[in-house]
């Protein structure tokens, strides 16, 4: 009997767009020279990828027994917080980040911590030999009889090893190096990444194994390949930070089992990653007192308030158009706030260059940072510093009003804990909550009122 003919298609390596013919430019993402030929998987292999759990039948939701899945804590509180309290058995976690940021270091340390809970961990490296992994483990002072290391990129061999070792946790470093023999395209292609991830997901669900996979990122900072990879997994973590700075930030951008607003702080040292228990002190330890353009905001990262310094430098432009730059703060937010300052306060900023930065490499995207940004710009423009013990919390409206923000009591308590004596908050946030001792809470209704009190003439 003749074999069924397998059809050929062309897949964009940037976005996953499929076409029956080759094209120089992808019509979906407009990238050039990204179309790669690939064969459709056979029906036999494709059917295995689609299954993600034990056989089941349609059941009324009222007849399904509710179970609370016990999480496994990693002995790393910062990671536990980001994951929502620990690792959920049977889940699949994708960890992305720039090259050299510390993804492999983080997962090797996590593997060692999990073995301390009498769990068996299989670390599969597609980028290093087992001897190279051993050298890195020695540098990180990582060891344990329950930590197994395996260097392989063939997915069938990986499956056999998982069946033999029977681990509780598996680490794949990285998904772009793993390939499936039923898929003809090269490792790291859209087809390979999709099929390998689907197979690993099936293993995780059927055998109740938590799997961590490392994903490469593009030059724009997104996970390489189509967004399908991020849709398939349960949790997506991004490991951020400047390679030339010691601090690293772990964020969850997707989490089926917890919040996506949590943040974990780590410091890279010669012995690996060390957790930072109080990030507010870290972000403020190098603040220069008496400098204009410097303010502090209490920002919420999930359930944790974090104090961050916002710096602004405003100076007359030397060219026709004023220049605006922002690091860690949304550029559009900065433009909006400066427009409000011009219209509602009368600051002549149209011929001023403005450079803003959230110190410490933190990214601030919540509305409560608006007031601190506005005061820092005005402080630099007038060359008049705020008090070193002032903290600013509030959202700025287009009419110049200061709008209420959530969890004001937690923010104020965190600021008071670090020695801030005068805290500016929205007038509407004043209410029946406990104000810390020796702290003056100043409620303001407009940005003009806030500037008069923070930067008096």
UniProtKB/Swiss-Prot annotation:
This protein's encoding gene: radA
The protein, known as: DNA repair protein RadA
Annotated SUPFAM superfamilies: P-loop containing nucleoside triphosphate hydrolases, Ribosomal protein S5 domain 2-like
Organism: Listeria monocytogenes serovar 1/2a (strain ATCC BAA-679 / EGD-e)
Region of interest (Lon-protease-like), residue spans: 353-457
EC number(s) from the headed UniProt entry: 3.6.4.-
GO biological process, one term: recombinational repair
Family: Belongs to the RecA family. RadA subfamily.
Function, in words: DNA-dependent ATPase involved in processing of recombination intermediates, plays a role in repairing DNA breaks. Stimulates the branch migration of RecA-mediated strand transfer reactions, allowing the 3' invading strand to extend heteroduplex DNA faster. Binds ssDNA in the presence of ADP but not other nucleotides, has ATPase activity that is stimulated by ssDNA and various branched DNA structures, but inhibited by SSB. Does not have RecA's homology-searching function.
InterPro entries attached to this UniProt entry: AAA+_ATPase, DNA_repair_RadA, P-loop_NTPase, RecA_ATP-bd, Ribosomal_Su5_D2-typ_SF, Ribsml_uS5_D2-typ_fold_subgr, Rubredoxin_2
Chain location of the short sequence motif RadA KNRFG motif per the record: 254-258
Annotated ATP binding sites: 97-104
SS bond partners: none
One GO MF term attached to the UniProt entry: ATP hydrolysis activity
Zinc finger (C4-type): 12-29
Alphabetical keyword list: ATP-binding, DNA damage, DNA repair, DNA-binding, Hydrolase, Metal-binding, Nucleotide-binding, Stress response, Zinc, Zinc-finger
Domain remark from Swiss-Prot or TrEMBL: Has a putative N-terminal zinc-finger, a middle region with homology to RecA with ATPase motifs including the RadA KNRFG motif, while the C-terminus is homologous to Lon protease.
Gene3D superfamilies per UniProt: 3.30.230.10, P-loop containing nucleotide triphosphate hydrolases
């Amino acid at each position: 009997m003749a074999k069924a003919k397998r059809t050929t298609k062309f897949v964009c390596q940037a976005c996953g767009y499929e076409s029956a013919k080759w094209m120089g430019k992808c019509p979906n993402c407009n990238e050039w020279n990204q179309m790669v030929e690939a064969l459709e998987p056979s029906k036999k292999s494709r059917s295995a990828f689609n299954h993600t759990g034990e056989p089941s039948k349609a059941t009324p939701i009222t007849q399904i027994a509710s179970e609370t899945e016990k999480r496994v804590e990693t002995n790393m509180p910062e990671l536990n917080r980001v994951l929502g309290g620990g690792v959920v058995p049977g889940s699949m976690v994708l960890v992305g980040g720039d090259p050299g940021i510390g993804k492999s270091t983080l997962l090797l340390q996590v593997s060692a911590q999990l073995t301390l809970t009498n769990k068996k961990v299989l670390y599969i490296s597609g980028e290093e030999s087992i001897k190279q992994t051993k050298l890195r483990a020695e540098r990180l002072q990582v060891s344990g009889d329950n930590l197994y290391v395996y260097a392989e990129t063939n997915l069938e061999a990986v499956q056999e090893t998982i069946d033999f070792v029977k681990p509780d946790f598996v680490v794949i470093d990285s998904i772009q190096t793993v390939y499936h023999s039923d898929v003809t395209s090269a490792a790291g292609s859209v087809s390979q990444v999709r099929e390998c991830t689907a197979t690993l997901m099936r293993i995780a669900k059927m055998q109740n194994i938590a799997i961590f996979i490392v994903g490469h990122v593009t030059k724009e900072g997104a996970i390489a390949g189509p967004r399908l990879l991020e849709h398939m997994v349960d949790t997506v973590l991004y490991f951020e930070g400047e390679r030339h700075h010691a601090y690293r930030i772990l964020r969850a951008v997707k989490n089926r089992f917890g919040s996506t607003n949590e943040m974990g702080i780590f410091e890279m040292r010669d012995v690996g990653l060390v957790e930072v228990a109080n990030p507010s002190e870290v972000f403020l330890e190098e603040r220069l007192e008496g400098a204009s353009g410097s303010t502090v905001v209490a920002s919420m990262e999930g359930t944790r308030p974090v104090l961050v310094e916002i710096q602004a430098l405003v100076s007359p432009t030397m060219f026709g158009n004023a220049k605006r730059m922002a690091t860690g703060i949304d550029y559009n937010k900065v433009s909006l706030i400066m427009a409000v300052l011009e219209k509602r306060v009368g600051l002549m900023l149209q011929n001023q260059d403005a450079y803003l930065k959230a110190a410490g490499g933190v990214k601030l995207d919540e509305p409560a940072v608006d007031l601190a940004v506005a005061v820092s710009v005005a402080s630099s423009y007038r060359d008049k510093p705020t008090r070193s013990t002032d903290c600013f919390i509030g959202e700025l409206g287009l009419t110049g009003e200061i709008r209420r923000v959530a969890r004001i009591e937690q923010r104020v308590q965190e600021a008071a804990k670090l020695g801030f004596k005068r805290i500016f908050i929205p007038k509407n946030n004043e209410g029946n909550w406990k104000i810390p001792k020796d702290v003056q809470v100043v409620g303001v209704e407009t940005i003009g009122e806030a500037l008069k009190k923070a930067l008096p003439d």
